[in-house]
Amino acid sequence: MVRGLFPGRFQPPHWGHIYAVKEILKEVDEVIIAMGSAQFNYLLKDPFTAGERIWMLREGLREGGVDLSRVVIIPIPNVENNLEWLGRVKSYTPPFDVIYTGNPFVALLFREAGYEVRQQPMFQRERYSSTRVRELLLRGDPSWEELVPKSVAEIIKKLRGAERIKTAASGEAEPHKW
């Protein structure tokens, strides 16, 4: 069995993520989604909890026609030391053969650790970006819904995600500044 690792924050998951997983599954038997920054939530850059992101991603993948029996989602907390983070990823996940990333620094870390690194499949990256989704939610622009699966949009609305992001933007949601 060939396993691929696909790290990301998925804040929130969008159609580009769904596309990437579908493309990765054309090359591997199973994809491990390493959901980074698992300990962060209710922040402008990280508004959703790890559990909420897992929920959104599973529903979005299901809506996108992905066989969830071939997908493992594992939350990975961040650490400040990059080599410690690499070790944490390796200890939290089942063994994997190849990593898919669009981040040159992540690619460097894994390549130096002896892993095969492949370019993450991209789908209209300038359009499909979690940063863009959060910015549109912050502005109250309803076009954010076009960028995510309908199931993800419904979850974001249920969680009052726009309100959460607007509150986080006020700066009151940063505990390290208290």
Curated annotation (Swiss-Prot):
The keyword ATP-binding applies. It is found in: Cytoplasm. Pathway: Cofactor biosynthesis; NAD(+) biosynthesis; NAD(+) from nicotinamide D-ribonucleotide: step 1/1. GO terms for cellular component: cytoplasm. Belongs to the archaeal NMN adenylyltransferase family. It comes from the Archaea. Its EC number is 2.7.7.1. InterPro entries: Cyt_trans-like, NMN_Atrans_arc, Rossmann-like_a/b/a_fold. Coiled coil: none annotated. Keywords: ATP-binding, Cytoplasm, NAD, Nucleotide-binding, Nucleotidyltransferase, Pyridine nucleotide biosynthesis, Transferase. One of its GO terms (biological process) is NAD biosynthetic process. HAMAP family: NMN_adenylyltr. This is Nicotinamide-nucleotide adenylyltransferase. It holds the Pfam family CTP_transf_like. It catalyses: beta-nicotinamide D-ribonucleotide + ATP + H(+) = diphosphate + NAD(+). GO terms for molecular function: ATP binding; nicotinamide-nucleotide adenylyltransferase activity. PANTHER family: BIFUNCTIONAL NMN ADENYLYLTRANSFERASE_NUDIX HYDROLASE, PHOSPHOPANTETHEINE ADENYLYLTRANSFERASE. Its main location: cytoplasm.
